[in-house]
Design a protein with these regions (language model features):
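Conserved phosphate/ATP/ADP-binding segment of small-molecule kinases
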Residues: 109-177, 211
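Short beta-strands and strand-loop turn motifs
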Residues: 64-69, 95-102, 126-136, 157, ...
């Protein structure tokens, strides 16, 4: 994921929250961002060679059970990370928490069309799109068909929203559907997506069911 100077989002926020939960984390930065809660000014991508070297440096550490990918500077960067994870940690669950647009409205992957986003989604085990990302990635596909076709579990955040509650729904490749409801807390704030994805990843890494992990993730941002 990206490094944000305010530490309110990105891998700094991820690690801080994961360690509060009791996890041991390693990180591979993908970009250095210039942003705060109100404005995104830009980002500088980490090179392919630097990402590869970071994976090499981590080989002496314990293997992860889950890898969560957040901000990527390009879809090729996502493919590079997935390739390294599959090579070194074949039993690891890969979660992609896509960040296509910042909360301040900046498009992060402006050249990625629906087809290329779908190909990228098919390279991970679990996808965590919010409402905007669902429309950009799924296109005309239903989540049920996409999950089966890509062999990817799709957790659609905020699939239903009332004044009192918000519902998340997971679509599994085998056709199973998992729902999770929580009290509505208003509009998303800067960094809340990081907390949700990190909490979900933590509980899955420790063997929790997807239903439990989704419920815990909702509580983390409530």
């Amino acid at each position: 994921g990206g490094i944000a100077p305010t530490c309110q989002a990105g891998i700094t926020a991820d690690v801080r929250h994961a360690e509060r939960l009791g996890a041991h984390c390693s990180v591979i930065p993908t970009a250095i961002t210039q942003q705060n809660a109100a404005k995104f000014l830009g980002m500088t991508a980490v090179s392919h060679e630097q990402i590869t070297q970071q994976f090499t440096a981590l080989q002496s550490q314990s293997a992860p059970d889950v890898v969560k990918i957040g901000l990527v500077a390009s879809l090729q960067q996502l493919y590079d990370i997935c390739s390294q994870v599959r090579k070194h940690y074949p039993h690891c669950i890969i979660i992609w928490d896509p960040i296509l647009r910042t909360s301040s409205g900046y498009d992060l992957l402006p050249n990625a069309d629906c087809e290329s986003l779908q190909q990228a989604a098919a390279s991970v085990d679990l996808l965590l799109p919010n409402h905007y990302e669902q429309t950009q990635i799924l296109g005309d596909l239903s989540p049920e068909i996409a999950a089966h076709r890509w062999n990817t579990t799709i957790v659609c955040k905020g699939i239903a929203h009332t004044a009192d509650s918000i519902s998340d729904r997971a679509y599994l490749p085998n056709g199973e559907i998992v729902d999770s409801d929580a009290p509505s807390v208003g509009n998303d704030q800067h960094g809340t997506g990081c907390l949700y994805g990190t909490t979900l990843a933590f509980h899955l890494a420790y063997g929790a069911s997807l239903s439990y992990a989704m419920s815990a993730a909702q509580r983390a941002v409530a």
